[in-house]
Amino acid sequence: MINFVMASRLTRRDFLKLAGAAAVGFGFRDFPPGGDPANNRPPSFNIGRTVYSLRYYEQPSSSSKELGFYVTDTVVDILEERVGDPEPEHNPIWLRTPDGWLHSSYVQPVQNQLNEPVMKIPAGGMLAEVTVPYSQSWLINDRGWKRGYKYYYASTHWVMRTFVGSTGIIWYSILDDRGGETYVVEAEHLRPIGAAEITPISPDGVNKWIQVDLGKQRLIAFEANRPVFTTRIATGYFEGDTPLGEYRVERKQPSRHMASDSIGNEFDLPGVPWVCYIAWTGVSLHGTYWHHNYGTPQSHGCINMTPEAAKWIYRWTEPFVPVDDDYVESETGTRVVVI
């Protein structure tokens, strides 16, 4: 797995060759070279969450004996990663669990980390990230507690206050930025994100720009003509969903509830992390928790990437966003070229 390389020593051809040949890993994680390793080094994953109901097999091949299936949101131990079936070509990675072999495309890499609750929330709220496989939220009204969304690992949310429930559990109140409702979730399931964690990367970088290659399903970030970062992506499933052309990062949000009620195009995704919009139609670069199927068209038009990669892009691109701000616009943001 290639995590960090010294880009200053690489030509563009070398960089792309390395990126394409990166040894396989659960996330095919491609990360920036040098600089800021404490904040950018990817976490180590040894558990996963099944995004859908998934079959597992005797061998890392769908042609081998089927042993059973996991229902949606099963959390499984990952004992080994291996190249299995050559198809699908974009992702031949299989995961060994205690029960059998599972294809990785719809297994979200997760951790299970509990956190010390913050009892006093700053005025205006606090950005926080889910650090458990998922956390059940609740909507409280005059009829009692109603089950709300599941907040999934690596999703981000705005915490507005803390309170202690009647049983002693400490809860965060989360403001939903789509419908305006307030949901509550166990506080120890979310990790506060501090200012140091999202400080701008290379703020003095010269002529920053991003290339989104639809054919190769890869994003490359440049400073002038020097590649500084690359990651696999998943763009629009249908031709034209992710439009070709030249754009700029014009709006940024660290968290966004994305949803559509269009027939045949329904989705409802709270807490989408590290969103960089490049068009007022809603096309954006952002982190993803509802699949792990990078390297092939997959989305409704947005440019999906791992949460870790999206966070790096969010920090590197202009406009820069203060940690206590939930929305920034700019007419001179980082250039994005979709080819």
Question: What are these language model-derived features?
Answer:
Residues E81, G100-L102, D177-G179, L190, ...:
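Solvent-exposed coil/turn segments that connect beta secondary-structure elements
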Residues P203-G205, F229, F238-E246, R251, ...:
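Exported/periplasmic cell-wall-interacting domains
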Residues Y70-P109, Y152-E188:
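SH3/SH3-like beta-barrel superfamily modules
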Residues T162-P243:
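Cell wall/extracellular polymer interaction/catalysis modules
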Residues M1-D14, A21-V24, G35-D36:
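N-terminal secretory signal peptides
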Residues G35-N40, L95-E129, L175-G205:
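Boundary regions of SH3-family modules and the immediately adjacent low-complexity/disordered segments
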Residues G68-V71, L95, Q217, E308-R315:
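Solvent-exposed, polar/charged alpha-helical surfaces in well-ordered, non-transmembrane soluble domains
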Residues G20-F26, P32-Q59, F69-T72, V110-W145, ...:
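SH3-family beta-barrel domains
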